[in-house]
């Protein structure tokens, strides 16, 4: 016979429970069909992780919160869609496959686009999507049979349709424009650039006037870009330079002449107050160039290699050229000085390459696309949790710039724009046979692909079949049920990457915001509040934590630490504590099982007959009300705190203890715990399932799962009975304190009395519980204070121990020893020493005075006790 474990062993049960529930289809839309209620629908979109990704602690937080909500709604009778999926992650995926090919000596350019894409699909089928399997270890109950991929056939068509609609409305245009350019990954949108503070230098360069005698000094952080200068610029109000406006200077090293212009854009206080204008390689200068009709000169190619505009420096890499340019400036006495200078430098969010402003012909989405969604947010048609995030959203949307959507990659959604030999340009959903304008059959498709965020911006509805053909797996069949989605849960770090774009993409195409509620959680940091990184060695691997502590412990911990708006400081101590919490509930079930083999479900308060059973159920009903309220308002940490306090602080610490007096309540306590496990289920799905069946004396293999049982609803309370038990608990705690104060061997307190601030109906119950749980032979309820007694004060009572018949000499001796010890501690503080008081640092003196105050308070209490004990 297999021996029952004495502690909870999550590794033995989690996989089995998950596989059974998944196999039965519980995670699917109709998995809870028997308890679904009419017109109740809930839809939650999983932020699609990169197909290259592995589960990290940030994913674990998002997925835990999402799954808690999905399980709660499923149990609460909602037809629930928790939509999983993967993002094709253009740059990241191409880089992974490209590296693998390079290891084999193959360049993607040698393969060509078509063959390279085949290789990517081969990699995706073999290795991509491992993260989906890893999610299952966490207990994620998404509808995995519906898993979507942003490069699915259906989603590809949705992307093309969105492009076509926006192109026809003039919201997508192609133009030469200043973009963020990564010499490795191509064009980037503004929010794909990460700025870092770097220690650099300000180079003060001499630009000689045409007379070659006088010169102007210009400060720049990028001397290598001087070859692209089209002008020098000063503020029109700067008296130092007014007389020079309109004259020309000679460009250092290459002797091209450029004009001196005036513009209020110049800050007179920065550097020398005279700046170089490089329209081809600076965002601000690009705008200045347009205002003043200056030439835009590009000095390097897409790979960052300097071109013929740079004279002798042609063919040098842009960053490597800097030192050589500075060296040549020094040789020609054109460098006035160099100063240290700290400034913000943009880097590619993927490869960390230094990003360049670069004029390039790209495709853009106009900012006007977002106007309607902005207005609807202001009208309150979608709510942010925490509410302060709307301010961040508004601030960003006010500064919205054209969104560069073209990327110079092979992997991704190829832009559906075709050009014929007669230069007619058009958009097509399918591969066209000829040009609709001139019927030419010589067509070329745009070689660029769309920004990854373009397809993920459609995620809220493209996954539901929008724009897809009837032959596709999903063809708008679910839009009427699940669009708009109900809730979005994600990290605040992708508010602008993804959330804002989903808002305007969805509203623009469907006329309605994609979700009603937007919950943005904080970041997970280490226990010191520092960002996790491999270099610091403080990364917490969720899969390792699941293996060590169990998925339930990790889920519960992350939810518990997710206080609104605050970063999460995670440590293994938290995980250990919540593993102990799971074990505490396990032990409570083991205790109940020793008393009785199985327990029935009792959902209503009126089904409970014993005072303890009714009290426990009444308390559970209050917690049910509070947990529901917390979940409905995305206060995950409040919900977990409520459950922890009830299950450990009330059920295990009190109800189990009370049952040792009121044994006939065991049956009803088992029923209360079964209901509490349903309440706990969304947070800790595995242990709640396991222990529920243990209490039922059933097995999941042969019976229904807790996850498709109704979530507790009843909130009826017996407040009078609750108050009576709160008084009883207070009396027991007070009596225990009294015993601790008095009992010094051989003194043993056998009798005590209780005075109540207000009467309760059943004092006999109080006496019975108090005698048993405070371990006293007799407890009397009185209305007066005994003459010679010591007392303890509780919230609802005052308890007394009569001293008349006790030999108090051991206790008196103990208290006198404590006084002697306190006296020695006072002397150690040195406050009686005048020299110390005179010379000690103020902080040391203040600390000593605080310590003395504490010692004097203790001394006063002990003396009061001695006075009472020694009175005749």
Give each language-model segment a name.
Residues 196, 277-280, 319, 356, ...:
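Conserved phosphate-binding loops in nucleotide/dinucleotide-binding enzymes
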Residues 347-351, 524-528, 532-609, 699-702, ...:
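Catalytic adenosine-cofactor/nucleotide-binding cores of aminoacyl-tRNA synthetases and other
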Residues 264, 292-303, 409-412, 416-421, ...:
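Alpha-helical recognition segments enriched in aromatics with Gly/Pro capping
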Residues 1-237, 261, 278-291, 295-310, ...:
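N-terminal, positively charged nucleic-acid-binding surface of large information/translation enzymes
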Residues 5-6, 85-88, 116-121, 145-156, ...:
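Conserved short loop/turn motifs at secondary-structure junctions
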Residues 135, 580-593, 614-622, 640-660, ...:
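Core structural elements
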Residues 87, 179, 183, 189-194, ...:
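Acidic, turn-prone loop/beta-hairpin segments
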Residues 576, 695-872:
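C-terminal low-complexity, glycine/proline- and small-hydrophobic-enriched intrinsically disordered tails
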């Amino acid at each position: 016979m297999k021996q029952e474990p004495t502690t909870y062993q999550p590794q033995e049960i989690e996989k089995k429970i998950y596989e059974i529930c998944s196999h039965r289809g519980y995670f699917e839309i109709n998995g809870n069909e028997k308890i679904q209620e009419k017109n109740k629908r809930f839809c939650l979109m999983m932020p699609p992780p990169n197909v290259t990704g592995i589960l990290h602690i940030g994913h674990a937080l998002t997925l835990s919160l999402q799954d808690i909500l999905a399980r709660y709604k499923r149990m609460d009778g909602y037809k629930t869609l928790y939509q999983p999926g993967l993002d094709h992650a253009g740059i990241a995926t191409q880089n992974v496959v490209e590296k693998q090919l390079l290891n084999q000596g193959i360049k993607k350019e040698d393969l060509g686009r078509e063959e390279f894409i085949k290789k990517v699909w081969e990699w995706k089928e073999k290795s991509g999507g491992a993260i989906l399997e890893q999610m299952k270890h966490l207990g994620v109950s998404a509808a995995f049979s519906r898993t979507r991929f942003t490069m699915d056939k259906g989603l590809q068509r949705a992307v093309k349709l969105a492009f076509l609609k926006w192109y026809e409305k003039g919201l997508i245009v192609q133009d030469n424009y200043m973009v963020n350019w990564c010499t490795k990954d191509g064009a980037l949108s503004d929010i794909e650039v990460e700025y870092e503070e770097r220690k650099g230098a300000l180079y003060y360069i001499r630009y000689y006037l045409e007379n070659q005698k006088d010169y102007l000094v210009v400060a720049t952080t990028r001397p290598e870009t001087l070859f692209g200068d089209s002008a020098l610029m000063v503020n029109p109000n700067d008296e130092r330079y007014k007389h020079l406006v309109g004259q020309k200077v000679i460009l250092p090293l290459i002797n091209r002449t450029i004009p001196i212009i005036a513009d209020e854009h110049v800050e007179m206080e920065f550097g020398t107050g005279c700046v170089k204008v490089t329209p081809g390689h600076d965002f601000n200068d690009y705008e200045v160039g347009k205002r003043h009709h200056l030439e835009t000169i590009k000095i390097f190619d897409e790979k960052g290699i300097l071109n013929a505009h740079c004279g002798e420096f042609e063919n040098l890499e842009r960053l490597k050229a800097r030192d050589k340019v500075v060296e040549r400036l020094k040789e020609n006495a054109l460098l006035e000085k160099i100063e240290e200078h700290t400034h913000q430098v943009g880097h590619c969010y993927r490869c960390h390459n230094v990003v360049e402003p670069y004029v390039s012909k790209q495709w853009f989405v106009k900012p006007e696309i977002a106007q309607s969604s902005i207005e609807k947010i202001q009208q309150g048609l979608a709510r942010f949790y925490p509410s302060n995030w709307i301010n961040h959203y508004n601030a960003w949307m006010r500064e919205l710039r054209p969104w560069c959507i073209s990327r110079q990659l092979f992997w991704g959604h190829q832009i559906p724009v075709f050009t014929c030999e007669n230069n007619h340009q058009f958009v097509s959903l399918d591969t066209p046979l000829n040009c609709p304008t001139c019927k030419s059959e010589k067509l070329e498709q745009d070689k660029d692909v769309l920004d990854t965020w373009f397809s993920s911006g459609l995620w809220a509805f493209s996954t539901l079949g929008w724009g897809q053909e009837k032959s596709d797996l999903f063809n708008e069949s679910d839009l009427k049920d699940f669009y708009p989605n109900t809730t979005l849960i994600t990290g605040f770090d992708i508010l602008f990457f993804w959330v804002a774009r989903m808002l305007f993409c969805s509203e623009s195409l469907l006329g309605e915001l994609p979700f009603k509620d937007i919950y943005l959680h904080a970041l997970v940091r280490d226990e010191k509040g520092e960002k996790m990184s491999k270099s610091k060695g403080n990364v917490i691997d969720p899969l390792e934590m699941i293996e060590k502590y169990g998925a339930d412990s990790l889920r519960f911990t992350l939810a518990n630490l997710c206080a609104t708006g605050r970063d999460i400081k995670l440590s293994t101590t938290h995980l250990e504590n919540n593993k102990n919490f799971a074990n505490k509930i396990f032990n409570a079930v083991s205790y109940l099982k020793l008393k009785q083999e199985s327990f029935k479900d009792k959902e209503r308060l009126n089904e409970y007959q014993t005072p303890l059973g009714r009290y426990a159920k009444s308390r559970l009903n209050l917690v049910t009300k509070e947990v529901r309220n917390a979940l409905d308002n995305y206060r995950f940490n409040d919900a977990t705190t409520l459950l922890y306090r009830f299950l450990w602080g009330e059920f295990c610490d009190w109800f189990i203890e009370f049952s040792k007096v009121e044994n006939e309540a065991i049956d009803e306590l088992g029923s209360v715990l079964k209901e509490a496990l349903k309440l706990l289920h969304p947070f800790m799905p595995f242990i709640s399932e396991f222990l529920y069946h243990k209490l039922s004396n059933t097995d999941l293999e042969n019976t229904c799962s807790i996850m498709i049982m109704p979530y507790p609803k009843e909130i009826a309370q017996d407040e009078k009975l609750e108050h009576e038990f709160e008084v009883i608990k207070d009396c027991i705690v007070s009596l225990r304190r009294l015993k601790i104060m008095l009992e010094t061997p051989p003194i043993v307190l056998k009798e005590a009395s209780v005075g109540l601030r207000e009467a309760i109906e059943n004092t006999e119950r109080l006496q019975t519980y108090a005698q048993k749980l405070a371990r006293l032979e007799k407890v009397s309820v009185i209305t007066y204070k005994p003459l010679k007694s010591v007392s303890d004060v509780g919230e609802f009572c005052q308890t007394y121990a009569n001293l008349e018949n006790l030999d108090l000499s051991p206790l008196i001796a103990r208290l006198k020893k404590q006084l002697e010890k306190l006296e020695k501690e006072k002397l150690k503080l040195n406050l009686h020493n005048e020299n110390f008081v005179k010379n000690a640092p103020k902080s040391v003196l203040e600390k000593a005075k605080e310590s003395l105050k504490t010692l004097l308070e203790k001394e006063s209490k002990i003396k009061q006790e001695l006075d009472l004990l020694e009175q005749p």
